[in-house]
Regions:
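Macrodomain-like recognition of ADP-ribose-binding/processing modules
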Residues: 1-180
């Protein structure tokens, strides 16, 4: 199946699951934006294998186009750039307390970017964790998930403190430190 037919398949399956009123555009870049938007708003319901296969094929093509960065030296590295390009053991996601990712279409937050590149399996997996846990994730705590369509093997989801007014309190500093 060629790329346009494949991404159309993924989009059409997700459009049929939801009532968005959105239509499938003509160009690949617009189709990619729509697919990401649909991934962003999709509830963590079990996807069909057909959807997973179509989505995974498109995300693999996008990953190849962006390029994968391999860090050959062992240890902890500081990276400035697109974290979804890193082929490492784990990347860290600044998650919300529901761990389900950002539901705002095309939002630029790291939570949205990671969930978009990992695919719908990540939200479904996080939902299973949260259902088993039975409560929101506490600030300063973390959960580890597979990376799914990311080059990284794992994603460490940690919930940081909300610091609304400039300088953090001592407690907020300690909570932030416990995240990392």
């Amino acid at each position: 199946m060629d790329r346009l037919k494949n991404i159309d398949n993924a989009i059409n399956i997700m459009l049929s699951e939801m009532e968005t009123g959105w239509t499938n555009p003509d160009t690949l870049p617009l189709k990619q934006r729509l697919m990401r938007s649909l991934i962003n708003i999709r509830q963590p319901d079990k996807p069909s294998q057909e959807l997973i296969d179509a989505q995974d094929k498109e995300l693999a093509a996008q990953r190849e186009e962006k390029g994968v960065v391999e860090l050959r030296q062992e240890g902890i590295h500081l990276w400035q750039g697109d974290i979804t390009r890193l082929k490492v053991d784990a990347i860290v996601n600044a998650a919300n307390s529901r761990l389900l990712g950002c539901f705002k279409p095309l939002h630029a937050c790291i939570d949205n970017v990671i969930h978009s590149a990992a695919g719908i399996q990540l939200r479904c997996y996080c939902n299973e964790i949260m259902q088993a846990q039975g409560h929101k994730e506490a600030t300063g705590q973390a959960k580890i998930t597979p990376g799914f369509n990311l080059p990284a093997r794992y994603v460490i989801h940690t919930v940081g403190p909300i610091i609304p007014h400039g300088k953090p309190t001592k407690e907020q500093e300690e909570l932030l430190a416990s995240c990392y």
